[in-house]
Amino acid sequence: MELFWEPACEKALLEAVDKEGLDGKIIRVGNLMSRQSDGEFQANSITNGFMRDLKGYATLKKFPVNSMDVEVDFSPIDEVAKTILLLSKTSSKFTVYHSANSHMVQMGDIIYVLNELGFGIEVVSDEEFLKSMKEMMMDDSKSMLVSSLISYSSSDMHTHSFILSDNEFTNKSLYHLGYKWPITDYQYLKNAIESLDTLGFFERTDL
């Protein structure tokens, strides 16, 4: 088995571009979500960390109030593919892009849609969330479903922070290329979560 450390791979590519004249680009992507065209997920797009977090909240049925205003992107996988094709044709002097939907949504929006669909997630204090998560981690039948939330297990939740990214340059490049990201509206969120539910995503322990 070969393991590739992402930063090391990027470093190697950038060195090849700089020293060997390789025509290459690094295009990082956001949270790959259901297609904009029909709301369907590709099989391998439901295994990323963000999706596992959603499963954890749905299983725990609790969400920390201080994270309700955290912003995330929903990047439809078919739209990401379009941007990659466009960005790959840009000047060779530009080598790093971040293809992520520029229209952010707050976690609170997602929690409310989940609840409208019957998931019954309670918004609670950080302390209550942490207590409930630790209790569920002791349940062998459910611990795997909430394992992605293990970073909250620190005794001090205030030590955790979200790393913000800036893809302003990429977004402006896409505008120059005649592309605009679709707005992530209520209907898209609802369709995406319903599609996940139909796939049995929230109950499966193998994803």
Where are these regions (language model features)?
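Glycine-rich "substrate-gating" loop/helix at the edge of Rossmann-like oxidoreductase active sites
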Residues: 35-46, 65-75
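Amphipathic terminal alpha-helices
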Residues: 160, 164-207
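A hydrophobic C-terminal alpha-helical subdomain
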Residues: 63-67, 130-180
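Alpha-helical substrate-binding/gating segment
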Residues: 51-65, 71-107, 111-116
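Active-site Tyr-X1-5-Lys
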Residues: 1-30
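Short secondary-structure boundary/capping segments
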Residues: 40-49, 112-118
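Short beta-strand segments
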Residues: 26-28, 33, 97-101
